[in-house]
Every structure is written in structure tokens, then in C-alpha cells.
């Protein structure tokens, strides 16, 4: 049974019983809700216009292809509100990461998020972006950066190192080895370990927060991932691939509270030009 099948059966059960098991439902990370999951949530709400509360960020949509919520009976038009105060990320990191996204992002039903008026409540050092000659030089640079952060008082478990996909994890391991600080690879539980750096893929970074983050291996054909580009069938799919890959880098960068380092090897990802400019 697939995840979609499971939610489909549960939705049918809720409808058949006629009385939902909950009066209200709160949904976080709503930008990545899938079709079957939304059908289930719609069944929970029945005819209560205030039965569902969604919190999400279209700029962090990294899993789900866009689709119409309205077509599934969930209408949030005119009922959404954009949160504009950022408590997690410094002004400098947020402002630079925002260069990866357009000023306004809209969903399929026309609901738009205007990101231009967002403010952070604290300042910090400017992010560092480095394009290195090869992966050995990159590992040395990131290793030195980790040592510098620890010298400033950042604890090892407050430092995360992220890469696009599993094949690039070896570069994160190499950087951790250069720093001389032990590291833990994040798994399904996505838990940090006291006294150890955290390394993992960008998809595992969502929902986490670190005082310092290094985003490595931002190379050409790695970000955006060449395999995804080659697999698309038309221009619309290609645009969506580029958007989700941008969102993925945005998510990784905004896991940093105070310090952000972004690195790549020549030729670097085209997205780094957006971060720099």
C-alpha cells in the first residue's frame, strides 16, 4: 500500500462515518502537502470553514509538485496572511538567501506571498560564498571555517554541513575530517548529537536550526541536479525543476541563524551568481 492509498482509505472512512474524529486540524509545512493528504484533510473539515489551519512557505516547497487546492475543496483565497517577522535568521543571511527567490511567489490558485516586506529581528555577519578550484581545496576551506566558528564559541552540535544529495556527502565528511571535529550523519530521526557536527543532505535540513551552516558542493550539474533536468518532458516541467532546486538551496541556507558559508567547485552552480548579485 502506498502513502497515497493509505490517506485515500482513511479519507473514505472519515466520510463514511459522517463525524470527523477531530474538531480542528493544524497543518505545518503545508507547502509540501500531497494530493491524497489534502483530500484527507478536506474530509476532516467537512463543511466547517474554520476547521483547518495551514502554516507554510511557498519558498520552501521542495517535495510536492504544485496543484490546485481549490479543485479538492480547500479554498484559502482571501483567507491567508503573510507572516513578515523572521525570528530565526539574521537580516544578513535572510536578505542574501532571498535573492534566490522572486519577490512574490504564487500557487496554482493564485494565492501570492509577497516576501519584500519581511524583516529579521537581529543582525549578524554577512554570509561567505567561496568558489574553489577543487574538492580538496573546498574541504580545507570549510574545515578552517568550522575551526574558526568553534573558536568563537559555537558548539559543534550548533554547526551543520549540508550538500545536495547523498553522492556529495563524502565532501562533507572530508570537511569535517579537516576540522578535526567528530561528525554525525543525520538520518531519518534528524537529531543532532552534543559534541559533534551534523552533516546531511539539504532535504533533511528542513525544520532544523543551527547557529552556523556550511552549504557545500554547489557545483554546476549538482545544483540544479543534472539528472532532474535531463528527465523533464517539457518547458513547464523544466521550470518547476529549477524552482524546486532553488527552494532547496534556500532551505539549506536559511537553516543558519548567525553564520553561513556557501561553497562550490569550478564551474560553480549558476545559483551562486544570484546569491552574489
Please annotate each region the language model reported:
Residues 1-23:
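Accessory N-terminal region flanking or inserted into the helicase ATPase core
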